[in-house]
Design a protein with these regions (language model features):
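Accessory terminal helices/loops
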Residues: 16-25, 220-225, 234-301
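Conserved beta-strand hairpin/beta-sheet module of binuclear metal-dependent hydrolase folds
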Residues: 34-78, 176-180, 185-188
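Metallo-beta-lactamase
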Residues: 37, 60-61, 68-70, 120-250, ...
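Solvent-exposed loop/turn segments at secondary-structure junctions
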Residues: 49-52, 61, 68-71, 95-100, ...
Length: 301
């Protein structure tokens, strides 16, 4: 039942480069949603798929992303254990199914869904996510963002100023990063995979330079005490984001240099330009050779 529910959103395309990540294939009945308190009003919820941000307080319940559709009841239960108020605002960091799967359930409950302009555009039509081999089917009306933003938007709730800003052509063409100014928390969505090689969705407008630029923007506003919620991986700090940014910039520069020297894509892969990064970042669902091939697509020729 759980897998059938997911496949109403996804169609797998077996001829494409890699299998769907393990967190999109698991038995959702066994997933536990765990909450980590970051400050008096802000939490990170972890289950399967993208990490969720939660802001509670006297004004409203505000969440960032909502993982997979089959997990919506568990996510609601985890929120209800923290606050009895309904979710009023739901912000999507981008359109991917592991961050928007619960939209329909929350939308039908009355949550106002907020996202970048390109997220709504992509969610209204079928999307081919080439690198992970999946077609994301068009979303029902209740799952669509009702408020869209081109550049940035602010929410003044629960004693905080929550600023969501667009980072162009990063993980996709519709990424929002969310900064809790007073709480000193940042949710980066999939512009940040903590401790692992990232997935950059080049078929949806993503670029390596855009991911580096997104990291640079957050690094400029972060302090050593800032808590950073990545799209995937454990809670991070500024040092972890700096290491991730440096890895991406270093590998990108090496690939650009090899291209400038006339090397073919296969020769660049054989040169292993990320080999010294594999120990620190190669343990995620994007494996070292896949990462280099993805970077070849994510760096314009």
């Amino acid at each position: 039942m759980q897998r059938r529910q997911l496949l109403t959103t996804l169609t797998l395309v077996s001829t494409l480069p890699i299998a769907l990540p393990v967190w999109a294939q698991q038995d959702y009945s066994k997933v536990e949603i765990k909450a980590e308190k970051l400050n008096d009003t802000t939490y990170m919820l972890v289950g399967a798929g993208g990490n969720i941000g939660l802001c509670v307080g006297e004004d409203a319940v505000f969440i960032i992303d909502d993982q997979f559709a089959p997990l919506a009841p568990k996510i609601k239960a985890a929120i209800a254990a923290i606050t009895k108020k309904p979710v009023q605002f739901l912000l999507n960091t981008h359109f991917h199914f592991d961050h928007t799967g619960g939209n329909e359930a929350f939308g039908r409950d009355g949550a106002l869904i907020v996202a970048h302009d390109n997220v709504r555009r992509r969610m209204t039509a079928d999307q081919l996510i080439t690198f992970i081999g999946a077609k994301q089917n068009a979303s029902p009306k209740a799952a669509l963002p009702v408020i869209t933003v081109a550049a940035e938007i602010s929410f003044h709730i629960n004693g905080d100023e929550v600023n969501a800003f667009h980072v162009p052509r990063a993980h996709t063409d519709g990424d929002l990063v969310v900064h809790f100014r007073k709480g000193d928390v940042v949710h980066m969505g999939d512009t940040f995979f903590n401790g692992m090689y990232p997935f950059i969705d080049t078929s949806s407008g993503g670029t390596a330079d855009g991911v580096v630029a997104a990291a640079d923007r957050v690094l400029a506003l972060a302090t050593d005490k800032t808590k950073i919620i990545p799209g995937h991986g454990p809670l991070a700090n500024k040092a972890a984001l700096q290491a991730y940014r440096n890895m991406l910039a270093t590998v990108a520069q090496r690939i650009k240099a090899l291209r400038a020297a006339g090397k073919s894509d296969d020769e660049i892969v054989a040169a292993k330009p990320a080999a010294d990064q594999d120990a620190a970042f190669g343990g995620g669902f994007i494996k070292p050779e896949q990462f280099v091939r993805m970077m070849l697509n994510a760096i314009p020729k």
